């Protein structure tokens, strides 16, 4: 019997006492107070739980975070500290935060930084990347419902500039890895073909029917995952138009809040059966 995976109550309880800007003046906040550090490191432990989990377990973790409404206080505090809410978002190149640092926060290296404030900035930046990577739907919902237009615009531009390409590259690497692990079918058993274009941020999925390929393309926008991927028809063979359009609409809806895997179970076309895609 399968039991839903969960994050420990003790760890989740540490996410309840979220800091706010009202609690600290600028001078104290720059010192990276212990309470703030503990709260942010608790989030880091939460995302560590995602890193080695299966897609099904990640889905359970995401539901816990969303149902508990934990993400809003984190992101509100994050974008206050990093300047997005004041239309003065942190410039990562000036802060000396490169792509490797965005992807990974190193506590030992952080201790050697010239200021506690830069340590805090690095951890916040890494947490935002991990949020986009592991709970993109929850982050996106926060962004869509953000009441401050200035913050919303700033966050989208900042995400596009520094984070989206990294998240997309991670996703496309996952798709390539998944595709490479699929068994090749026999001559009588057709299999789904996957082609990835990293430069154009596209995934092509196709199935051969009568020596022709029926295929779709999934295009990832410049501010992904805040903006959704687009599913478009490339070539339709042997499938009625109405059924094909239903499939495209289904797939578009299924990936609206998805980032980890575009295709995980082998999917197929046939003249009398719909093209079945499972997205996690």
Spans of features found by a protein language model:
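Long alpha-helical solenoid repeat scaffolds
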Residues: 1, 39, 43-46
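Extended amphipathic alpha-helical coiled-coil/heptad-repeat regions
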Residues: 1-11
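Ser/Pro/Thr-rich intrinsically disordered low-complexity regulatory tracts in nuclear proteins
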Residues: 10, 17-21
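Glycine-centered motif in EGF-like
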Residues: 23-34, 39, 50-207, 224-279
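Glycine-centered tight beta-turn/hairpin loop motif at sheet-sheet or coil-to-beta transitions
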Residues: 209-213
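Short beta-strand micro-motifs enriched in acidic
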Residues: 219-223
